[in-house]
């Protein structure tokens, strides 16, 4: 009996490591673009958000059947919590609002963590690639449009 319990425990630990690693990689990829552009929330913030969201979801899924934890409620609270963090990076200066893209990116990093925690790795890869591409492509388009408008 001891052997089976050890195997089951090792599977749980391996599953946890896999999910946290996936969340970490997604957060790093998303944060790398923000860091490269010198934004206020870069590698560390996006990676920690993805990991934190993953841990909260993993915990809720772990105890869902034992204590009647509703994992969807935990997911919604992750969104609320990230909303506060995102609000902290949004600034208004004169008639311009700055930080909306960074706030939205932090929100997407939390979603990446949630996807990793639920084992939706293909969806996680698609989300991560889309977030990076959107930030890169539309960041370039935005700056190009701003230059033309200023002329």
Where are these regions (language model features)?
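Membrane-helix interface "capping/anchor" motifs
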Residues: 36-41, 91-102
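Hydrophobic alpha-helical membrane segments of integral membrane proteins
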Residues: 99-104, 122-127
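Alpha-helical transmembrane segments and their membrane-interface boundaries
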Residues: 1-74, 121-124, 140-147, 151
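Alpha-helical transmembrane segments and their membrane-interface exit regions
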Residues: 82-85, 130-140
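Small-residue-rich segments of transmembrane alpha-helices in multi-pass membrane proteins
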Residues: 48-58, 80-83, 104-117
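Membrane-helix boundary connector in multi-pass membrane proteins
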Residues: 94-96, 110-123
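Hydrophobic transmembrane alpha-helices of secondary-active transporters
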Residues: 25-30, 84-91, 113
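Alpha-helical transmembrane-segment detector that highlights a single hydrophobic TM helix
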Residues: 67-90
């Amino acid at each position: 009996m001891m052997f089976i319990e050890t195997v089951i425990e090792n599977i749980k630990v391996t599953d946890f490591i896999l999910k946290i690693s996936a969340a970490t990689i997604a957060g790093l990829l998303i944060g790398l673009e923000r860091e490269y552009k010198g934004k206020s929330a870069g590698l560390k913030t996006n990676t920690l958000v993805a990991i934190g969201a993953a841990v909260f979801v993993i915990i809720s899924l772990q105890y869902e059947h034992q204590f009647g934890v509703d994992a969807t409620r935990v997911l919604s609270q992750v969104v609320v919590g990230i909303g506060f963090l995102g609000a902290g990076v949004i600034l208004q200066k004169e008639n311009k609002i700055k930080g909306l893209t960074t706030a939205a990116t932090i929100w997407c990093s939390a979603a990446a963590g949630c996807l990793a925690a639920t084992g939706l790795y293909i969806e996680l890869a698609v989300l991560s690639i889309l977030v990076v591409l959107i930030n890169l492509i539309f960041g370039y388009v935005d700056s190009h449009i701003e230059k033309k408008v200023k002329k």
